[in-house]
């Protein structure tokens, strides 16, 4: 997912933060906020994987490098950093596929992901609340309002895509009804936040016929996503050790039965 997200940003309109001051993209608000939040989210997710795969104090060099490159440095172009990060992630995936790199326990990884996503939702809700409750609100929204909205939307998109990928990579989760239902709820909640597409971001009172409060709306969806992610993490933590392996063994025996 991380490699695909990086490729989409680089192969699309390009990285807005790298543009010269005269370039039209340098004057945008939503796109730079989206891209910056996406890179930050991927960096934190990669850092989480590095922590889960660490052996003592030894962290996988490729994961460590990717997390550092994705975090960005002010004043430095992101395109070469993103390219190098994608290469590092690809090297790790290649080594892991050949059994040459440490990989995290699947349930532990899924649980850590859910906790991370819940933390994102909580932090974004706080930032959104600060903007919503400003004493003086610009019409229809300030630059900071727009940046806060699209930062939250970008993280929601990353979380939703990661959850979808997690289920595809571990189909045995469908054999655990409570966990499967919790995944459904989390995917739906994050998807609602990620799919908001206002023509113009508005941070108004919401009582007018045309201008809604989009910051409040995405904050509501993030509240549901936070609760769903916490619930998913709790349920994954309650899954008995070896449960997925037992399911695989049962399916093998059933397939071999006459």
What do these predicted regions represent?
Residues 29-39, 78, 110-112, 143-158, ...:
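Short, low-complexity cationic-aromatic patches
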Residues 43, 47-50, 118, 125, ...:
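Structural signal for well-ordered, non-membrane alpha-helices
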Residues 82-196:
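Extended amphipathic alpha-helical interaction segments
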Residues 1-18, 117-125, 242-258:
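Ser/Thr/Asn(+Pro)-rich, low-complexity disordered segments
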Residues 15-27, 98, 130-144, 168, ...:
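Short, charged/polar, low-complexity loop and linker segments
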Residues 71-116, 212-236:
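Short, well-ordered, aromatic-rich surface patches in folded extracellular/luminal domains
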Residues 159, 164-258:
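A cross-kingdom marker for long, charged
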Residues 1-84:
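N-terminal Sec/ER secretory leader and immediately downstream segment
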């Amino acid at each position: 997912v991380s490699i695909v997200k990086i490729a989409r940003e680089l192969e699309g309109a390009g990285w807005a933060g790298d543009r010269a001051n005269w370039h039209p993209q340098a004057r945008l608000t939503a796109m730079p906020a989206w891209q910056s939040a996406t890179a930050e989210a991927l960096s934190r997710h990669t850092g989480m994987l590095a922590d889960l795969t660490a052996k003592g104090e030894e962290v996988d060099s490729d994961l460590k490098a990717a997390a550092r490159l994705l975090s960005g440095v002010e004043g430095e172009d992101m395109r070469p950093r993103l390219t190098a990060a994608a290469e590092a992630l690809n090297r790790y995936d290649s080594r892991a596929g050949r059994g040459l790199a440490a990989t995290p326990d699947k349930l532990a990884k899924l649980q850590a992901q859910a906790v991370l996503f819940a933390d994102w939702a909580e932090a974004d809700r706080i930032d959104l609340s600060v903007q919503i409750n400003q004493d003086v609100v610009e019409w229809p929204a300030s630059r900071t309002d727009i940046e806060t909205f699209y930062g939250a939307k970008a993280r929601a998109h990353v979380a939703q895509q990661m959850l979808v990928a997690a289920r595809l990579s571990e189909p045995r989760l469908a054999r655990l009804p409570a966990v499967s239902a919790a995944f459904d709820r989390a995917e739906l909640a994050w998807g609602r936040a990620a799919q908001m597409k206002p023509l113009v971001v508005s941070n108004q009172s919401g009582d007018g016929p045309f201008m809604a409060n989009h910051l409040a709306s995405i904050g509501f969806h993030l509240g549901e996503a936070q609760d769903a992610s916490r619930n998913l993490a709790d349920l994954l933590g309650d899954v008995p050790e070896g449960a997925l392996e037992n399911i695989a063994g049962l399916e093998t025996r059933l397939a071999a039965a006459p």
